[in-house]
A protein has these predicted regions:
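Flexible, glycine/threonine- and acidic-rich loop/arm segments that mediate assembly and lattice contacts
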Residues: 1-279
């Protein structure tokens, strides 16, 4: 096989136009199921606080005689909790010349970089919110740090052996990891029961990809069907039927892969002191 003498080919020519697609492809995930699934509210100080309360235990011996002289019980005070506001940022700088030249895939370089940084910031926030991290008060040389999801869960847990320990007080210190073990349905059912017994009504199970696949094999999810019109059994378990109601199963790429969370989303929220801003 040989080329005819003096054939002028693409390898010799000058001035061929580039074939550069006008689309920029990215498969980097931007879903933030925890932050997107909980309440949003405003903070007015760097330490955002709220109160919790509980009812007295139900009693079966609450029966009195007629005309009894009342003995007043001392009221119980509310519990005051709080979390630090954390400053997160992404910075971009673009030259005026770059913004002026012709580019593939975007017209305005600064706008493109801001959009990209905003998505990265959102991922960082999801990672911080679901982290096992204790709060930091901060000072002029130390940044404030929020208490992550795992530092708030001090009861209703199932953890591995060894030195594993729950946080001593909600939102004040991180949990101590125990020895890692296989995720089982018995563990999941135990935690759901603990939550329900304590008055909770959990509706979400959040976990990483590995444990999501493990959960797909649990008995509680084996009756999960697609829409009623076709009754087709699907492989992915999006709803887990527990003894205390159906629970949405939500995979999260940014929470700790070693942990699975049983949550009641309406009892969680994120407060913004300064929402997303361009400066």
């Amino acid at each position: 096989m040989a080329q005819v003498t003096n054939t002028y080919s693409t390898y010799d020519a000058v001035g061929e136009r580039e074939d550069l697609s006008d689309i920029i492809y990215s498969i980097s995930p931007t879903d933030t199921p925890f932050m997107s699934g909980i309440a949003k509210e405003n903070a007015t100080a760097v330490f955002h606080e709220w109160q919790t309360d509980a009812l007295a235990a139900a009693a079966s011996d609450n029966y009195q005689i007629e005309g009894d002289e009342i003995s007043f019980a001392a009221p119980s005070a509310t519990t005051r909790l709080g979390n630090r506001t954390q400053i997160s940022r992404k910075s971009v700088i673009v030259s005026g010349t770059l913004d002026s030249v012709s580019k593939a895939g975007r017209n305005n370089e600064l706008a493109y970089q801001i959009s990209k940084a905003s998505k990265e910031l959102k991922r960082d926030m999801e990672t911080s919110l679901t982290a096992n991290q204790a709060p930091v008060t901060g000072d002029d040389s130390t940044p404030r740090r929020l208490a992550g999801l795992e530092s708030w869960i001090k009861t209703n847990t199932s953890k591995g052996g060894g030195s594993g320990a729950d946080p001593t007080t909600s939102g004040t210190n991180a949990r101590t990891d125990g020895t890692q073990r296989a995720f089982t349905e018995a563990q999941l059912k135990d935690v759901i029961k603990q939550c329900w017994d304590e008055g909770g009504d959990p509706s979400m199970i959040m976990l990483g990809s590995f444990n999501k696949q493990v959960l797909s094999g649990f008995t509680g999810g084996s009756t999960r069907f697609d829409p009623a019109e076709n009754k087709r059994l699907v492989a992915a378990v999006d709803v887990y039927e527990s003894d205390f109601g159906a629970m949405t199963v939500v995979p999260n790429r940014f929470s700790r892969s070693r942990s699975a969370y049983v949550l009641q989303p309406d009892m969680w929220g994120v407060a913004f002191l300064r929402d997303f801003q361009l400066m």
